[in-house]
UniProtKB/Swiss-Prot annotation:
Biological process (GO), any one: protein import into mitochondrial matrix
Zinc-finger in keyword set: no
UniProt note: domains: The J-like region, although related to the J domain does not stimulate ATPase activity of mtHSP70. It nevertheless mediates the heterodimerization with the J domain of PAM18 and is therefore essential for PAM complex function.
Location within or outside the cell: Mitochondrion inner membrane
Subunit annotation: Heterodimer with PAM18. Component of the PAM complex, at least composed of mtHsp70, MGE1, TIM44, PAM16, PAM17 and PAM18.
Record's function text: Essential component of the PAM complex, a complex required for the translocation of transit peptide-containing proteins from the inner membrane into the mitochondrial matrix in an ATP-dependent manner. In the complex, it is required to regulate activity of mtHSP70 (SSC1) via its interaction with PAM18/TIM14. May act by positioning PAM18/TIM14 in juxtaposition to mtHSP70 at the translocon to maximize ATPase stimulation.
Protein family per UniProt: Belongs to the TIM16/PAM16 family.
Protein name: Mitochondrial import inner membrane translocase subunit TIM16
Stored InterPro entries: J_dom_sf, Tim16
Stretch list, region J-like: 52-127
This protein's encoding gene: PAM16
PANTHER family assigned: MITOCHONDRIA ASSOCIATED GRANULOCYTE MACROPHAGE CSF SIGNALING MOLECULE (PTHR12388), MITOCHONDRIAL IMPORT INNER MEMBRANE TRANSLOCASE SUBUNIT TIM16 (PTHR12388:SF0)
Organism of origin: Yarrowia lipolytica (strain CLIB 122 / E 150) (Yeast)
Amino acid sequence: MAHRLIYQVVVTGTQVFAKAFTQAYKQAATAQAASKTSKSAASKFGGLQLDEACKILDVDETALDKVVAELNKKHKLEDIAESESVLAQIDKKFTHLYTVNSEHKSGSFYLQSKVYRAMERIRGELELDPLPKPEIEEPKKKEEEKK
């Protein structure tokens, strides 16, 4: 009788442990698959997440989501005009931050790179053309000023 009771306890404990182990394994597998997709999207655009890129360029994520939706629809002219104004504001912020952080103006190449990668990430999200680097006016050298 005692053997039967011990046997039932061992079998029941093994079943509970096996079920818990398989559920934990399934959860770990789905979490790993989800992290791979988010990491691949981030690595495609310089390692920046979209929310981080929006923070760098001071862009409202909801406005960006509206632009993406309108670019996908493209049926109302007034909505497209609103989207273009948001894109123009983003371009203006990018140009300003990129120029301010240029090495010629005692800026930081690191910050300039962050600004560039943020804009690259946003343009990638909007599926726009690749981003050209803006022209920066270089300061005149002392030799040119003497002539």
